[in-house]
Amino acid sequence: MAKFVFVTGGVVSSIGKGIVAASLGRLLKSKGYSVSILKLDPYLNVDPGTMSPFQHGEVFVTEDGAETDLDLGHYERFTDTAMSRLNSVTTGSIYQAVINKERRGDYDGRTVQVIPHITREIRERIKRVANNSGADVVISEIGGTVGDIESLPFLEAIREFKGDVKRNDVVYVHVTLLPYIGTSGEIKTKPTQHSVKELRSIGIQPDILVCRSDRPINDGLKNKIGGFCGVNSDAVIASLDADSIYSVPLALKDEGLCKEVLDCLDLNDHESDLKDWERLVHKLRNPGPSVKVALVGKYVQLNDAYLSVVEALRHACISHDASLDLHWINAENIESEGAEKLLQGMDAIVVPGGFGNRGVNGKIAAIRWAREQRVPFLGLCLGMQCAVIEWARNIAGLEDASSAELNPNSKHPVIHLLPEQQDVVDLGGTMRLGVYPCRLQANTTGQSLYNEEVVYERHRHRYEFNNSYRTLLMESGYVISGTSPDGRLVELIELKNHPFFIACQYHPEFLSRPGKPHPLFGGLIQAAQMRVPSSPSEAFNPQSKIIEKKSLEQQ
């Protein structure tokens, strides 16, 4: 039977619960335990799929097509374990399920209430993850902050949960903040005490406290916190600000977080195997020459909107002994200031996904610059669609070429709506979502990078390459290097006689891992290194073993 860990947060939002949960998952896995992690989000949206990137940040897509919180990306990257739609729970999805049951008459005419019906549904979702995944340990991160009214049903549900299992089958971890007051030169514990008091008022006594701080916490302070909060001082874990999120698992290991969790759950504390992770962090802290990568997007004001893209670039740089020098470029600024001014000197250009008209012409201008100046380029989702439009306009002679999404009146809609999307009205959860196969063409850069005939990638889009223009674009020099197995959908395009020019309709960033960078990102960084004078990289060769998919153990 599975064991359960609940991670809550206090004092402030964005305190790092997701990284703590992901780090704990990594530590447990290093000791031989299988792990699944779920996020319980207290907003009324059924999922974040229709939320603005400025509001929510990135929407992470799972293999089975769920649109989820970006924390699931952290969970997958840290544990190298695929999550599913069951691992993402929102207040909206809970209420939707309960109301649907009420409409079907499942409650036999009873009055439907937050307690017990909503809280029972939450508990059932957590147990469903345990049953579906078969994990030894299920970690649940409760979104929001203790004291928020939105989080109360979830906190009540996890309080009730301890009545469903044996005492040593559940542990409560509370992440809190220890602020430093510069004028007095002191770390203050009072906010943590009040946060724990608030949690206790709900009926939850935390077993472990993870205390965020920007400076070391001495034993005297740990004893004080433990005494006031009813926690053993050994279970007061310091979590100092780190140079990288990938350093956090090692820091929490040294603080004894995993040992305390295993003790509470009555699990054996096996010898841990973190050599690969330690090697990863060492390479991250000791990089080679930097590569300048321009990320040309429309949501660059909030970096979290492209979180997985940035992490995929970072993974590739770690693998290739490079330092990532990332330049955030607003696509709209390219429209007003020009590509040359903003992109001159870049070693690589990435144009990620997005929706709507705003900034598209700037993205197209950036792609033209990359093509004409022979700068390594990678386009993702909308980035591929913009690359097709750029080629159609400037090489294939279709001056009016556009996407049906961007210009419904275009005479040459080289990108059009997927046939199965024609009659779709609702926005939420109705796109082409999740994993689909892609057959790669032999003797192409794409096939050489993957070193596979068929690959499986995650999608999130409604629009697709218009096959009416396939012959024209191919005759003008475009290379279609990947399609759906039936050949109907164009998934991957590239250019010959260019250092590196590849664009895909899918989202490869969702499959990149710290120890296993995605081949497309690996190829981009290796090509970018060729533009760095002091780079040790050899001439770019897509068949090079450097860019094959491999783990750090093989390096």
Swiss-Prot record:
PROSITE patterns: GATASE_TYPE_1. Catalyzes the ATP-dependent amination of UTP to CTP with either L-glutamine or ammonia as the source of nitrogen. Regulates intracellular CTP levels through interactions with the four ribonucleotide triphosphates. The lineage of its organism: Bacteria, Bacillati, Cyanobacteriota, Cyanophyceae, Synechococcales. The active site is at 381 (nucleophile), 507, 509. Residues 534-544 have a biased composition (Polar residues). One of its GO terms (molecular function) is glutaminase activity. This is CTP synthase. One of its GO terms (biological process) is 'de novo' CTP biosynthetic process. Residues 292-534 form the Glutamine amidotransferase type-1 domain. It comes from Prochlorococcus marinus (strain NATL2A). It holds the Pfam family GATase. The gene is pyrG.
